[in-house]
A protein has these predicted regions:
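C-terminal motif of bacterial Sec signal peptides marking the signal peptidase cleavage site
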Residues: 16-19
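Bacterial N-terminal signal peptides that target proteins for export
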Residues: 1-8
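A sequence/structural signal for flexible, mid-protein segments enriched
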Residues: 21-419
Length: 419
């Protein structure tokens, strides 16, 4: 459901049923904006979600969450599931498995700002398992001849929808990868301290030793991280009007060595969701529009209507979709190693004298100035070694800290349970 908003927030508005997309000028005042409602029910027991927001104007790409709306999911048997407003514009309700069976149908009802909005009913259609996930190594030639080519992996899936299965699908992907910092910790700057023995101020720099067990743990403490994130792309497919419902080699997404994702270990969790014909048209045109325009930020405003309408004002434009989807998931992991393309750890402060001045924050040897002027510690320094592989204490430099602290690239030090 968050994926829907990620694309709508870019101002992409398309027609759903027309194969030819025509420019559209909305029949709303510049100050009125429009309402966005997204919701979904899956066959997985647990919380089902909806999201409600409004823009301040038609051309505004900032969405303002709407709270304190009355939101309900109603199934075909008349069961009502009231959604709680648990976060800004976010609503949820818990549904047990007994209410999430194949063939059940659901609608979303929203009462907000004195108006009632309802979706069409959408049904849970049967979903086959994902049979396999695999990849092929590829090379991508750049459009700019001055750039180097990239290598990467093209992922594919197979599934068999022969029999009583849905015809329309979309896929979501969550990727996780392990990566290392470019360097381990060897030198730690902890500020300025007063040495009572020598009666003078000194830099507090700790040099770690590989022969000390605790130091070795410190060296590796910020070296290895993991990142998990959603893949921000749309993938849809339909077997409508196709005799063979067995699908092999369906391409999904590409990951390249432009980042650090393929340096150690990479895992992808793919979620396969069934779609009704209305939901498929909605997602498929979002996918087409984003591909044709080189990204959704480059699109012009079009109208994208889903299956939600205002009962009190049929002329009101309501953006978004409520859908019901059966879900199957499968994880694939590979330990393929591809060197990261063109990455360099630059010095922030190079040269011993410059580094001393930077770390001291004032005249060397004198009491340090206001602590607010000192660099934040700890800082991890870059060492240099001589021909005998001995540390040269007069040649430290300060490099980008993300080259030593892997968490500064967005990762966590906690290994995933499935790793």
């Amino acid at each position: 459901m968050q994926a829907i908003r990620a694309y709508l927030v870019l101002g992409v508005l398309l027609p759903v049923l027309n194969a030819c997309i025509e420019p559209f000028t909305p029949n709303i005042g510049e100050s009125e904006g429009y309402l966005v409602i997204n919701g979904t029910v899956t066959d997985e027991e647990g919380y089902q979600f909806a999201e409600i927001s409004r823009t301040s104007s038609y051309s505004d790409r900032v969405y303002f969450p709407l709270n304190e709306c009355e939101v309900k999911v109603i199934d075909g048997q008349g069961n009502i599931f009231i959604m709680e407003n648990y976060d800004n514009g976010q609503y949820r309700t818990w549904m047990d498995k007994q209410y999430l069976q194949k063939g059940n149908r659901y609608m979303l009802q929203v009462i907000c700002d004195g108006k009632t909005y309802e979706s069409e009913y959408d049904s849970l259609l049967p979903c086959p398992d994902i049979d396999s996930i695999y990849y092929k190594e590829i090379s991508i030639e750049p459009d700019d001849p001055t750039e180097t080519s990239k290598t990467g992996l093209q992922f594919y899936i197979d599934y068999d929808a022969t029999g009583d299965y849905a015809e329309n699908y979309r896929w979501e992907a969550v990727e996780t990868w392990e990566y290392n910092a470019e360097e381990r910790i060897f030198l730690i700057y902890n500020g300025i301290k007063f040495d009572e023995h020598d009666s003078m101020y000194k830099l507090d720099i700790r040099i770690l030793s590989i022969f000390n067990e605790n130091d070795r743990k410190t060296m590796d403490s910020l070296y290895t991280c993991w990142i998990t994130r959603e893949v921000k792309s749309i993938y849809t497919y339909t077997s409508h009007q196709k005799i063979d419902k067995k699908v092999s080699g369906l391409p999904l997404y590409v990951v390249t060595n432009k980042s650090n994702r393929l340096t150690i270990k990479y895992s992808i969790l793919i979620k396969q969701l069934t779609l009704s014909s209305t939901a498929f048209n909605y997602w498929n045109q979002l996918q087409t529009q984003s591909q044709e325009n080189g990204g959704l930020y480059e699109t012009q405003p079009y109208q994208l209507k889903g299956n939600i309408k205002c009962l009190d004002d049929e002329e009101e434009n309501v953006i978004g979709l409520f859908s019901a989807s059966s879900v199957r998931t499968k994880r694939f992991t590979t330990s393929i190693h591809m060197n990261r393309q063109n990455y360099y750890c630059a010095d922030i402060v190079e040269g011993w004298n410059r580094l001393l001045t930077y770390l001291w924050g004032g005249e060397i040897g004198q009491p340090p100035p206001n602590e607010d002027l000192l660099p934040v510690s700890p800082l991890y320094l870059h060492p240099f070694f001589d021909e005998m592989n001995s540390l040269r204490p007069d040649t430290f430099s300060l490099i980008n800290q993300s080259c030593i602290d892997c968490t500064l690239k967005g990762g966590t030090l906690t290994k995933p349970d499935y790793w």
